[in-house]
A protein has these predicted regions:
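Generic recognition of well-ordered alpha-helical segments
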Residues: 34-35, 44-45, 54, 68, ...
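C-terminal cap/loop subdomain of S1 sulfatases and analogous C-terminal strand-loop tails that border
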Residues: 1-48, 79-83, 94, 108-109
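Intrinsically disordered, low-complexity polar regions and short flexible loop motifs
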Residues: 51
Length: 218
């Protein structure tokens, strides 16, 4: 990097995703590094030359240093915070049809979704929405599964349900069904897809693997 592009400071911003109990906000889980100074969460200042273990907060003794370090942060936050939003997965794209969704991409308000086969194999009673972007309006086939299609495993549930773009569909699942199919008309635009698979006791988990296929354009 040339001299004109060189920075004398570094900003570290940690964002742990929906597993965090609070929504991302300025200063939380942040650190600004410059020379021997470390400003934590915009409040705690440490001098690594005299205090490498960062035990003594000297923010009150060094207000000018705190002010200087804080001046770097908000322009940085304003540039990156718009990107801390759910990404919508394309449906009905000419380059990716059908779209295969997995529970790893559920957007949970708190905690993490089932994201590995060890968790999914326990058929947890949890579900969440996929943020999706219907790129082509038309008739879609939505197939609910608890395992990838390649596993060729039947659904362990008696009833399935979907909700998308204000449309709700529900139907009985017959024994040995590999994938529960719904067909719905979808308009173009961003929306959410949520799925439920109910057992005989009424407990519901989501369809951890769901295929969405555009079958007829409108």
């Amino acid at each position: 990097m040339d001299a004109a592009g060189h920075r004398d400071h570094l900003i570290v911003q940690y964002h742990g995703g929906p597993g965090f109990k609070i929504s991302p906000e300025p200063w939380s889980y942040s650190c600004i590094l410059k020379d021997q100074w470390r400003l934590i969460n915009g409040e705690e200042l440490y001098d690594l030359r005299s205090d490498p273990e960062q035990r003594i907060n000297v923010a009150d003794q060094q207000p000018d240093i705190v002010k200087n370090l804080k001046s770097y942060y908000l322009p940085f936050w304003n540039s990156v915070s718009p990107k801390i939003t759910p990404v919508s997965i394309a449906l009905g794209s000419p380059t990716d049809n059908p779209t295969v969704l997995s529970s790893q991409d559920w957007y949970m308000p708190r905690g993490n979704p089932p994201w590995n086969f060890g968790q999914i194999g326990k058929l947890p009673s949890v579900t969440g929405p996929w943020m999706v972007d219907v790129q082509t309006p038309g008739l879609y086939r939505i197939t609910l599964r608890q395992w990838p299609a390649q596993a060729n495993k039947p659904i362990k549930a008696v009833r399935g349900k979907i909700e998308i773009a204000g449309v709700i569909r529900e139907s009985e699942i017959k024994p040995q069904t590999l994938g529960q199919v719904f067909e719905v008309e979808l308009p173009k635009g961003k929306t959410q897809l949520r799925t439920w698979l109910f057992d005989s006791k009424g407990n519901a988990g989501g369809a951890y693997f769901t295929d969405v296929e555009l079958i007829k354009e409108r």
